[in-house]
Regions:
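A short glycine/serine-rich beta->alpha loop
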Residues: 96-99, 221-231
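Aromatic-capped interface at the extracytoplasmic side
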Residues: 18-35
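PDZ-domain C-terminal substructure recognizer with occasional recognition of PDZ-binding tails
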Residues: 163-207
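Gly/Ser-rich catalytic serine loop of serine hydrolases
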Residues: 133-138, 225-239
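Conserved PDZ fold ligand-binding element
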Residues: 138-160
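Hydrophobic membrane-insertion alpha-helices, especially the h-region
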Residues: 4-22
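PDZ/PDZ-like peptide-tail recognition elements
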Residues: 30-45, 49-61, 80-133, 189, ...
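Extracytoplasmic/secreted envelope proteins and their assembly/folding machinery
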Residues: 68, 106-110, 139, 159, ...
Length: 239
């Protein structure tokens, strides 16, 4: 009986060591992958040479991965607060990283097609709220994952259009935001407020507003890239 308890205790300890998440992220060198393995252009021609996309591997730490990072070259552990905004969950963080990657791909396609004098259709859906800034008035009405689709009943066509609309306002102006949350449309009110000590810059009070959009290019571009996020590889995609 005593040996059984010891065995169970050891098993629980091992499982905790291997699987309990810690408030750290482990970063290490990732893979170098040829762009042509996941990006294709309909009717495109293959050139000589090869373009490689280099990635950084990142995972949530467990006690095991944390200890391993201390002895593995080119591997480091950082507190999750370095990557996650206040109030942002791990799922929200993953979603933000995916949107950053989507934006990188879309910007690359748009720029490449402009250089080739080809048109790209953009279906702009809104602005993704990465997280409201703690202490801001927006923190009372917005949550990570919300998508802002209109200001004072007027939609916007690009991220820059959204930013210009906000910056044209004065601190203290009340604005009505149309948002999508969990598949439902809502209307909330907040105030434009200063976002720096000088008071020269104003905003709604959210971190890193990201565009939520889809693009359609002709000839069609297919990017079959999974499990890669972040604002990376834009130059490689464009080339």
């Amino acid at each position: 009986m005593k040996s059984l308890k010891i065995g169970l205790g050891l098993l629980v300890t091992v499982l905790l060591f291997l699987f309990v998440p810690l408030p750290y992220y482990i970063s290490s060198p990732g893979a170098a992958t040829s762009i042509e393995e996941f990006l294709t252009v309909e009717g495109g021609e293959k050139d000589e040479g090869e373009l490689m996309m280099v990635t950084i591997s990142q995972r949530r730490a467990t006690p095991f991965w944390l200890v391993e990072s201390w002895v593995t070259p080119f591997t480091e552990a950082n507190l999750s607060s370095r990557y996650l905004y206040d109030g942002e969950s791990e799922a929200d963080y993953d979603r933000r990283q995916q949107l950053l990657m989507d934006s990188s791909q879309q910007a690359a396609i748009q720029y490449a097609y402009e250089l080739a004098d080809e048109e790209v259709a953009v279906d702009f859906e809104g602005i993704y709220v990465s997280a409201p800034i703690p202490g801001s008035l927006a923190a009372n009405v917005l949550k990570p994952g919300d998508v802002i689709t209109a200001i004072d009943g007027m939609s916007f066509a690009t991220r820059m259009d959204f930013l210009n609309r906000v910056m044209e306002s004065d601190a203290g102006d009340e604005v009505e935001l149309t948002i999508e949350r969990d598949g439902e449309e809502r209307i909330v009110q907040t105030l434009i407020q200063p976002i720096d000590q000088s008071g020269d810059r104003v905003g709604i009070g959210i971190y890193e507003p990201l565009p939520v959009q889809e693009i359609a290019a002709d000839p069609k571009v297919d990017v079959a890239l999974t499990n890669v996020g972040g604002p990376s590889a834009g130059l490689m995609f464009t080339l």
